[in-house]
Each structure stands twice: as C-alpha cells, then as structure tokens.
Amino acid sequence: MQRRIMGIETEFGVTCTFHGHRRLSPDEVARYLFRRVVSWGRSSNVFLRNGARLYLDVGSHPEYATAECDSLVQLVTHDRAGEWVLEDLLVDAEQRLADEGIGGDIYLFKNNTDSAGNSYGCHENYLIVRAGEFSRISDVLLPFLVTRQLICGAGKVLQTPKAATYCLSQRAEHIWEGVSSATTRSRPIINTRDEPHADAEKYRRLHVIVGDSNMSETTTMLKVGTAALVLEMIESGVAFRDFSLDNPIRAIREVSHDVTGRRPVRLAGGRQASALDIQREYYTRAVEHLQTREPNAQIEQVVDLWGRQLDAVESQDFAKVDTEIDWVIKRKLFQRYQDRYDMELSHPKIAQLDLAYHDIKRGRGIFDLLQRKGLAARVTTDEEIAEAVDQPPQTTRARLRGEFISAAQEAGRDFTVDWVHLKLNDQAQRTVLCKDPFRAVDERVKRLIASM
C-alpha cells in the first residue's frame, strides 16, 4: 500500500500555576479548557471542522486525534494544527480565570510523563490491508518499534537513586507488553483492538502506542514515515533478518538508556544484537526498496534522515542532525546549559528545561523559541498549519466530514458525526455511512449537505 491512511492521537499534560505554585487540579483546568467546546458542542468529545476529534481523555488529559491523512507532510501539518487548537483553548481558559478573579498560568505539555510518574501517550494509526497474517506484521514490526527511539525519541532526564541519566524515550519506562488489546491498563507496544473505522472486510487499523510525542516536525515525519515504509515493505514481501526479541519490554528500556545504540539486547534463542544493528537492517532494506517503488520525495527525505541519524549515533557526532531529531536537539540544549552554569544533569533547572521544551504555547515554550531561531528544522509552515486548523485534508474522507460539519453548523442544524457516520438529527434521521477513508468526494454527502 503506497498510499496509506494515517493519523496521530496526542494526549497533552496539563497544569495551572500561580506565581510558581499549583493553582488548580488537572480536573479543574480541563473543565476551564473545555468550557468553550462544551458550549458549542454540548459535549467534551467533539469533531471539528478540520475533520479532527478533540476530547477529554481518562485522567483529565485533553486529546487531539488528527483527521485521516494520506501523506507525511499533511500528517505533520495536521498534528501541529492540534497544538494550535489546544493553545487557542488555553488562551481562552486563562482569560476566563482572569475574569473570575482566579488568575493563573495554564500550561499544556506535548510530552509523555509528569512529575508524579504518570504516563500519557502519543498513538499512531496506520491503515493496513486485512489480507495477510497480522502476526507476521507484528513479528517484523516489534524489533523495529523497540529500537525506533534511537531515531525519534523525545529524550528525557531520568532521575535514578544513583544519578540522573539521559534517556532516548519518555514512553519506554511505561510499556508493559509487546502486543495486546488494552491501551491503558497494560500499555503494549502494538495494540490489536480491531476497530478499522473503515470497511472491516478490506482493512484493519494498526494502533501503535509506544511512540513519544514529538515537538520536532522532522522527527514526527521520521517516526511515521519509517513505520509506514516498514509496513509497506512487509506487505510487499520483503524479507528481513530475524531480530525477534527475547524480552521486548526489557529491551525497550535497555535501548532507551543507551544513547550510543551499541548495548547488545538479547534476541530469541540466545543471540544478541544492538539497537544500531537492528535499525541498520531495516534501513538497508528501505534503501533497496526505494529502488523498486514509485519515486516519492517525502519518503526519500525520510530515508535520508534515517541514514544520517544512524551514522550520527554510530560516530557520536550529531552535528549533521542536531536540528532534526528531538532527543538530539534537547540533549544539546542541556549540555550547553550545563557547560555555561557548571550544572549537573540532576539539577532542578534541567528538569524545568525538560518540561519547558514541551510547552506548546508559542513565545513561551522552549522548542518554539529554538524553532524561531532556526535551531529546529521544519517541514511545514505557519501558513499551512493555520489552514489545517480550519480545513480538513482535501484528499481523504476527512474532507467529507469537515464539509458536513461546517455546513450543518452554518445552517444551525443538529447533527452527529463519528469517524464513519454523518447524521442529521431531524425527523428523518438521515445518515451517510462513509466506509472508504480514501474517498474525498461522495454524491450522498453532497445531497445531504444540499438538503440543509
């Protein structure tokens, strides 16, 4: 499948402080954030005009699920649009607090762990064909996903009883199973719950919940681009060396704790391989696969960065990728700070920087400041993100949903939508079922809109 439907769901950490002290509980902050949403949507679970879903997840975490996208840059742009949508709610909520005489600064963090050790996720969705063994896909994909943090981790300072250590991934410490149907209780790497949001006879949806939330646009593109490419290779019958892991959960932590990528992890049958070895295998197959697939500039950009990052890890010289990979950008920031102020990694100021890197408020968040200074590379523009806040992707089913929502809101009509249904809540209860996520034009939807 060279054209694939993809989406990213991001849960955001939330807090409210006043002069540095916590002001409101996460529950209370979430209520202020969603008050405007509830006022027009009559719910804290809504679909937006750009086709995305916005809702309050378990544990007061606002969650944004992008609309269905069919290209990497489109997905990165719509993922960034989610940050802007949430930032808009943040500004509105702060104003409400001020109006009520409460005051306080609200922070939304696009990260995966809070100071209390709770974890929240960034889930990737990939449409895959129903034909073929799911077990083969997960067998080949698992070693790739366990070691992928080497190329696209968000980076984190982990405080241990002995000392502070810099890790590749925020999420790795919180994953407890390889493949499972649960998402919150056991936190697997691949979630097998079969909700395709499409024609179930043709497709299934691969739900990957091991990834970090990325601030860097280039890292997000690398994360989803490499996974989509590995899926494409599996579907094409590409043969990979067997890197089945003896214990994926132990391996994911071992990989996260080793920025050199060289520490051996145990494979099934007692063999060993490093994260670098495993990633090199998938990368080498990808380079070969590019010779046989249709040319695609975005995929070629992904494979180029993949190779440069593996070279950087091998040589431990990150100069050629230090504006493109989250964990590298963040580590460089910390190292500069430590050198300038003669500071240990365990210093509270570093922990503060670690958090501020993920602050999504423009002009305040550290990643945003780095990006403005040209210290973080981009694949999209502010103009394209602004458009994605209001407009759905024009090449997928999201366009139908977005146009239906816009028309119903403008006509003052009561409606219900989900990923596959568009329904007018009138006497006739007219409903259109959109089972094909690749289809951006549908006469039935046009007629439904015209009838308003």
UniProtKB/Swiss-Prot annotation:
Q: Which residues form the active site?
A: D57
Q: Where are the transmembrane segments?
A: none
Q: What does the record note as the disruption phenotype of the gene behind this chain? A: Cells lacking this gene have no detectable pupylated proteins and substrate proteins accumulate. These cells also become hypersensitive to reactive nitrogen intermediates (RNI) and fail to grow in both wild-type and nitric oxide synthase 2 deficient macrophages. Moreover, they display increased resistance to hydrogen peroxide.
Sorted alphabetically, which Pfam families does this protein's record hold? Pup_ligase
PANTHER family in the cross-refs:
PUP DEAMIDASE/DEPUPYLASE, PUP--PROTEIN LIGASE
Q: How does it assemble?
A: Interacts with the prokaryotic ubiquitin-like protein Pup.
Record pathway: Protein degradation; proteasomal Pup-dependent pathway; Protein modification; protein pupylation
GO biological processes: modification-dependent protein catabolic process; proteasomal protein catabolic process; protein pupylation; response to nitrosative stress; symbiont defense to host-produced reactive oxygen species
The source organism is Mycobacterium tuberculosis (strain ATCC 25618 / H37Rv)
Q: What else is known?
A: The reaction mechanism probably proceeds via the activation of Pup by phosphorylation of its C-terminal glutamate, which is then subject to nucleophilic attack by the substrate lysine, resulting in an isopeptide bond and the release of phosphate as a good leaving group.
Q: What is the effect of changing R53E?
A: Abolishes pupylation
Q: Which HAMAP family match?
A: Pup_ligase (MF_02111)
EC number(s) in its UniProt entry?
A: 6.3.1.19
Q: Does the keyword Magnesium apply?
A: yes
Give the protein's function: Catalyzes the covalent attachment of the prokaryotic ubiquitin-like protein modifier Pup to the proteasomal substrate proteins, thereby targeting them for proteasomal degradation. This tagging system is termed pupylation. The ligation reaction involves the side-chain carboxylate of the C-terminal glutamate of Pup and the side-chain amino group of a substrate lysine. PafA is required to confer resistance against the lethal effects of reactive nitrogen intermediates (RNI), antimicrobial molecules produced by activated macrophages and other cell types.
The record's comment on protein family reads: Belongs to the Pup ligase/Pup deamidase family. Pup-conjugating enzyme subfamily.
UniProt keywords (A-Z) are: ATP-binding, Ligase, Magnesium, Metal-binding, Nucleotide-binding, Ubl conjugation pathway, Virulence
- Protein's name in the database: Pup--protein ligase
Q: What is the effect of changing Y55K?
A: Abolishes pupylation
